[in-house]
């Protein structure tokens, strides 16, 4: 039994030492009252992929500017140049690289109402696709101005949904109002991409 006494004493001493440290630490926190701070000698890395309202408004503005740019390019340089620009706009603004985009254009008709593919979106904007013979090119209608009036914006994490009116004016000054819903997703590079786009003409009784 004598062989175990030194080990017991060492264990007891270690326990007492640890307890003492714990007591000191607790006393230190207690003495500090409510003024408890956490510090670090290194800058803490933070990952924040939440979308801001300003990013949403900027993405909407960019869409409107792109539509006008396609129209003016068509008027000045023809369909080939307008189509090349439309392809760039779709690749830059929409999320087709992730998979199907929930795109329901204003003037699309059955059985090709929903344009879940890049090809379908391109056909709607600039036409010239035998798979979508009814498309004449919505973006080729000499649009000159786009005004966006949001009814509401719902932001949650890295997605944002908007609903409201978009007023598009052509070069003759004729304005067309559409009801529009967009949903944006912030990608791994911090860019907002459209993953839902529903557009329709206002109901008239």
From Swiss-Prot:
One of its GO terms (molecular function) is lyase activity. Hydrogencarbonate binds at residues 106, 124. Keywords: Lyase, Signal. Residues 1-24 form the signal peptide. Transmembrane segments: none annotated. InterPro entries: MICAH-like, NTF2-like_dom_sf. It catalyses: hydrogencarbonate + H(+) = CO2 + H2O. Does not require a metal cofactor. Changing residue 124 to A: Loss of activity. Its EC number is 4.2.1.1. Activity is not affected by EDTA or 2,6-pyridinedicarboxylic acid (PDA). Activity is not affected by addition of most divalent metal ions, except zinc ions which decrease the activity. Inhibited by the iodide ion. It comes from the Bacteria. It is an enzyme of class 4 (lyase). Catalyzes the hydration of carbon dioxide (CO2) to bicarbonate (HCO3(-)). Has only very low bicarbonate dehydration activity. May function even in metal-poor environments. Homotetramer; dimer of dimers. Belongs to the iota-class carbonic anhydrase family. This is Metal-independent carbonic anhydrase. The lineage of its organism: Bacteria, Bacillati, Cyanobacteriota, Cyanophyceae, Nostocales.
